[in-house]
Amino acid sequence: SKGKHAAIGYNKRYLTVVDKTVATGVTLTDARWENKFTAEFQGLYRNFQLSSQYYWSHIAREVGNSYNTDGFYVSARGIVVNPGNYKYNFAGSGVDNPDNKNLEVMLGYGYLNLRDGDAYAKNKAAIAAGLPGVDLSKAGRMSDVSVGLSYFLNKYVTFRLNYHFVTVKNFDLEKKNVNVLQARV
Protein backbone atom coordinates (compact mmCIF):
# COMPACT_ATOMS: atom_id res chain seq x y z
CA SER A 1 0.00 0.00 0.00
CA LYS A 2 1.21 3.48 -0.81
CA GLY A 3 1.17 6.05 1.93
CA LYS A 4 3.10 7.42 4.84
CA HIS A 5 4.77 4.86 7.06
CA ALA A 6 6.85 5.17 10.20
CA ALA A 7 10.50 6.12 10.36
CA ILE A 8 12.79 3.83 12.35
CA GLY A 9 16.11 5.09 13.63
CA TYR A 10 19.13 3.41 15.15
CA ASN A 11 21.86 5.57 16.68
CA LYS A 12 24.88 4.65 18.76
CA ARG A 13 26.77 7.37 20.59
CA TYR A 14 30.26 7.22 21.94
CA LEU A 15 30.54 6.00 25.54
CA THR A 16 29.93 9.25 27.35
CA VAL A 17 26.90 11.24 28.42
CA VAL A 18 28.84 14.50 28.15
CA ASP A 19 29.48 14.33 24.40
CA LYS A 20 26.25 13.51 22.55
CA THR A 21 28.02 12.88 19.20
CA VAL A 22 26.47 10.03 17.22
CA ALA A 23 29.20 7.56 16.27
CA THR A 24 27.08 5.61 13.82
CA GLY A 25 23.42 5.75 12.95
CA VAL A 26 20.70 5.40 10.36
CA THR A 27 17.13 6.65 10.05
CA LEU A 28 14.99 4.67 7.64
CA THR A 29 11.84 6.26 6.27
CA ASP A 30 8.81 4.46 4.87
CA ALA A 31 9.23 1.54 7.26
CA ARG A 32 6.33 -0.87 6.96
CA TRP A 33 7.27 -3.35 9.69
CA GLU A 34 10.24 -4.56 11.71
CA ASN A 35 11.31 -7.99 12.97
CA LYS A 36 13.72 -8.27 15.89
CA PHE A 37 15.50 -11.28 17.29
CA THR A 38 17.86 -11.53 20.24
CA ALA A 39 19.59 -14.38 22.06
CA GLU A 40 21.38 -13.97 25.38
CA PHE A 41 23.73 -16.17 27.38
CA GLN A 42 24.70 -15.75 31.04
CA GLY A 43 27.13 -18.23 32.56
CA LEU A 44 28.37 -18.26 36.16
CA TYR A 45 30.94 -20.54 37.72
CA ARG A 46 32.11 -19.57 41.20
CA ASN A 47 34.02 -16.30 40.77
CA PHE A 48 33.86 -16.21 36.94
CA GLN A 49 31.11 -14.81 34.76
CA LEU A 50 30.58 -14.93 30.98
CA SER A 51 27.84 -12.85 29.32
CA SER A 52 26.94 -12.48 25.66
CA GLN A 53 24.09 -11.32 23.48
CA TYR A 54 23.35 -11.37 19.75
CA TYR A 55 20.71 -9.13 18.19
CA TRP A 56 19.33 -8.82 14.67
CA SER A 57 16.73 -6.56 13.08
CA HIS A 58 15.03 -6.62 9.67
CA ILE A 59 13.11 -3.53 8.55
CA ALA A 60 10.76 -3.93 5.59
CA ARG A 61 10.27 -0.72 3.63
CA GLU A 62 8.18 0.49 0.71
CA VAL A 63 9.18 -0.90 -2.70
CA GLY A 64 10.93 -3.87 -1.08
CA ASN A 65 14.03 -1.92 -0.08
CA SER A 66 14.55 -3.71 3.25
CA TYR A 67 17.35 -3.03 5.72
CA ASN A 68 19.15 -5.39 8.11
CA THR A 69 21.19 -4.62 11.22
CA ASP A 70 22.93 -6.88 13.71
CA GLY A 71 25.43 -6.93 16.52
CA PHE A 72 26.72 -8.77 19.54
CA TYR A 73 28.76 -8.39 22.68
CA VAL A 74 30.65 -10.73 24.95
CA SER A 75 32.17 -9.98 28.34
CA ALA A 76 34.15 -12.08 30.78
CA ARG A 77 34.49 -11.11 34.44
CA GLY A 78 36.35 -12.55 37.34
CA ILE A 79 36.73 -11.67 41.01
CA VAL A 80 40.46 -11.59 41.68
CA VAL A 81 40.69 -10.13 45.21
CA ASN A 82 38.58 -11.69 47.97
CA PRO A 83 37.08 -14.20 45.51
CA GLY A 84 33.46 -14.88 46.24
CA ASN A 85 30.90 -16.61 44.09
CA TYR A 86 28.69 -14.69 41.70
CA LYS A 87 24.99 -15.21 42.36
CA TYR A 88 22.20 -15.07 39.79
CA ASN A 89 19.21 -12.94 40.76
CA PHE A 90 16.13 -14.63 39.30
CA ALA A 91 13.82 -11.76 40.27
CA GLY A 92 15.94 -9.19 38.42
CA SER A 93 17.18 -11.54 35.67
CA GLY A 94 20.77 -10.54 36.27
CA VAL A 95 23.82 -11.08 38.43
CA ASP A 96 24.05 -9.57 41.90
CA ASN A 97 27.09 -7.55 42.90
CA PRO A 98 29.77 -9.59 44.68
CA ASP A 99 30.37 -9.38 48.41
CA ASN A 100 32.08 -6.48 50.17
CA LYS A 101 35.65 -5.49 49.33
CA ASN A 102 35.93 -7.55 46.12
CA LEU A 103 37.98 -6.52 43.08
CA GLU A 104 36.66 -7.60 39.69
CA VAL A 105 38.49 -7.62 36.33
CA MET A 106 36.46 -7.38 33.10
CA LEU A 107 37.33 -7.96 29.43
CA GLY A 108 34.76 -7.24 26.74
CA TYR A 109 34.13 -6.90 23.04
CA GLY A 110 31.11 -5.42 21.29
CA TYR A 111 30.23 -5.12 17.61
CA LEU A 112 27.39 -3.21 15.96
CA ASN A 113 26.65 -3.40 12.24
CA LEU A 114 24.26 -0.77 10.86
CA ARG A 115 25.84 -1.10 7.43
CA ASP A 116 23.61 -3.06 5.02
CA GLY A 117 25.62 -3.10 1.77
CA ASP A 118 22.73 -4.28 -0.43
CA ALA A 119 20.43 -1.52 0.83
CA TYR A 120 23.24 1.02 0.39
CA ALA A 121 23.73 0.03 -3.27
CA LYS A 122 19.96 0.14 -3.95
CA ASN A 123 19.73 3.54 -2.23
CA LYS A 124 22.56 4.99 -4.37
CA ALA A 125 20.90 3.64 -7.53
CA ALA A 126 17.56 5.17 -6.52
CA ILE A 127 19.15 8.58 -5.90
CA ALA A 128 21.01 8.37 -9.25
CA ALA A 129 17.67 7.64 -10.96
CA GLY A 130 16.10 10.71 -9.37
CA LEU A 131 14.04 8.76 -6.84
CA PRO A 132 13.93 9.64 -3.14
CA GLY A 133 16.60 8.05 -0.97
CA VAL A 134 17.75 8.20 2.63
CA ASP A 135 20.98 9.50 4.14
CA LEU A 136 23.12 6.44 4.85
CA SER A 137 26.42 8.31 5.23
CA LYS A 138 26.55 7.69 9.00
CA ALA A 139 25.41 4.06 8.79
CA GLY A 140 28.37 1.89 9.63
CA ARG A 141 30.12 -0.56 11.86
CA MET A 142 31.32 0.03 15.40
CA SER A 143 33.52 -2.19 17.53
CA ASP A 144 34.50 -1.71 21.15
CA VAL A 145 37.28 -3.53 23.01
CA SER A 146 37.13 -2.89 26.76
CA VAL A 147 39.06 -3.63 29.94
CA GLY A 148 37.83 -2.69 33.38
CA LEU A 149 38.29 -2.90 37.12
CA SER A 150 35.45 -2.72 39.63
CA TYR A 151 35.95 -2.46 43.38
CA PHE A 152 32.83 -3.37 45.36
CA LEU A 153 33.12 -1.48 48.65
CA ASN A 154 29.75 -2.83 49.78
CA LYS A 155 26.41 -3.86 48.30
CA TYR A 156 25.56 -0.27 47.33
CA VAL A 157 28.89 1.43 46.44
CA THR A 158 31.09 0.38 43.51
CA PHE A 159 34.15 2.14 42.09
CA ARG A 160 34.73 1.44 38.38
CA LEU A 161 37.60 2.22 36.03
CA ASN A 162 37.10 1.23 32.38
CA TYR A 163 39.14 1.68 29.21
CA HIS A 164 37.52 1.34 25.78
CA PHE A 165 39.10 1.33 22.33
CA VAL A 166 36.30 2.15 19.89
CA THR A 167 36.56 1.86 16.10
CA VAL A 168 33.86 3.33 13.84
CA LYS A 169 33.69 2.96 10.05
CA ASN A 170 30.69 4.58 8.38
CA PHE A 171 29.81 4.29 4.67
CA ASP A 172 30.94 7.72 3.48
CA LEU A 173 33.09 8.95 6.35
CA GLU A 174 36.66 8.29 7.45
CA LYS A 175 37.40 5.50 9.90
CA LYS A 176 37.72 6.78 13.47
CA ASN A 177 39.52 5.29 16.45
CA VAL A 178 38.57 6.67 19.86
CA ASN A 179 40.13 5.94 23.25
CA VAL A 180 37.80 6.35 26.23
CA LEU A 181 38.77 6.19 29.91
CA GLN A 182 35.86 6.19 32.37
CA ALA A 183 35.85 6.44 36.14
CA ARG A 184 32.54 6.01 37.98
CA VAL A 185 31.25 5.63 41.53
Task: Describe these PLM feature segments.
Residues 2-185:
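Outer-membrane beta-barrel pore domains
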